[in-house]
Amino acid sequence: MKGRKYTMKTGFNWKRKLLSLLLLFCLLTGLAGSGTMAHAYNVPDNMKWWADDKFGMFIHFGSYSYFGHGEWAMQTEGISKETYQKTISAKFDPEKFDAQEIVSYAKKAGMKYLVFTAKHHEGLAMWDTKVASFTDTTGQKIYSLQQYTPFGKTNRDIIMELKNACQQAGIHFGLYYSIIDWNHSSQTVEGDFTKLASWEARTAYIADMKAQLKELVDTYDPEIMWFDGDWTYKKDNPTLKKWWTKQDGQDLYQYMKSLKSDIIVNERVCRSFGLGDFECPEQSIPEKALSRPWETCQTMNNAWGYKKDCEKSYYNVRYMIQDLVEVASKDGNYLLNIGPKGDGTMTAGSRKILKGIGNWMNRYGDSIYGTSGTPFAKKPSWGRYTRKDNVIYAHVMKWPKDQKLVTKKYAGKKVKKVYLLQNGKKLKYNATGKKVIIKMPEKKPDKADTVIAVQYQ
């Protein structure tokens, strides 16, 4: 299993770094004001709900779930289009998929939004697409859940089921869409890249891709469109020319905004160019808050789509909670993935983790929702900070042996009270100089993270 990562390459220029330093200076000197949010970046109006929600569910689910070797199996195991269609997609029948149950678990875990894979790299559309070029290799059948698999006989629409369940639960709904399509006649997977049939095929494919995206927006009205599969370049192989460019990414972003002006779109319309509305580091956390909105997407067991071999490799609940807090302390969002099995049922491991996080969020959710990142430049040795209005939340992961927690004093403000967030019990403290020294209970209430609220006047 891969360990937690706290570094990443951002590709930002010096102007963005300067902006980050200026915003941090405002936080440290109290210029942001005690009654307003002070993010490390500007939050557009259409993204305020997203920035406040902080925590979402990612769902990787497709024909690869039936195979149980992960969503990249077609590529990693060298399976041809025809073989994949006949031996995997044609047998995919998720009759036990229960949108209400999945959304219920998301809500109880404290998740505020959800993103579902409408189409992953293997190309099977999880909705009843009408775009004619997306077929199997015979050209006779539309390659979709409804028209190609045994599940089609049910006349069910699992994306709409999820959409409706989210709406009932008050959870925001989003969709994932892969730019590359290993099944489409215009493309063939070759190693980690995708070979293009011709430049004429490229033009036709992009038009058809946009037609599918219009179907998704018109039918399901997603609030987020989460793109992926924007890599198509291999320098040492001229047959794998870079057929998806920055200009294509800009055009795709504008197209999505033309379909729905307030839709939130991630950077992977074409990554590394600062496009889209937010950055999305994958299974990694940046060392510092970024200069624009960002979201870490994370697996529970190092697998996105259902992978049998990873079912005994789940992280523990404590790890996942501390990951969430690490992200929130840096002003980011946390998109945590589940990969249902081929029949549509949730795995036991994902249920356990979601329940565990939910138990913690029931006590400490106020220290996550609607918060901004730490107002202090230095990380404490005992945990992390988040902030909301005039309250600094100390996330204590390492309990002080002498029962004295030393926290930084916020911007010369006067402390009003200090209390345990889980029950409101007041704690004794001594505010002196640049420190607030808090008398802690003898025993740590929560092993993963106990939150102490320091309220300022």
Annotate the PLM regions.
Residues 4-7, 33:
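Low-complexity intrinsically disordered segments
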Residues 6-22:
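Bacterial N-terminal signal peptides that target proteins for export
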Residues 29-40:
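Sec-dependent signal peptide cleavage junction
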Residues 41-457:
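Mature catalytic domains of secreted/periplasmic carbohydrate-active enzymes
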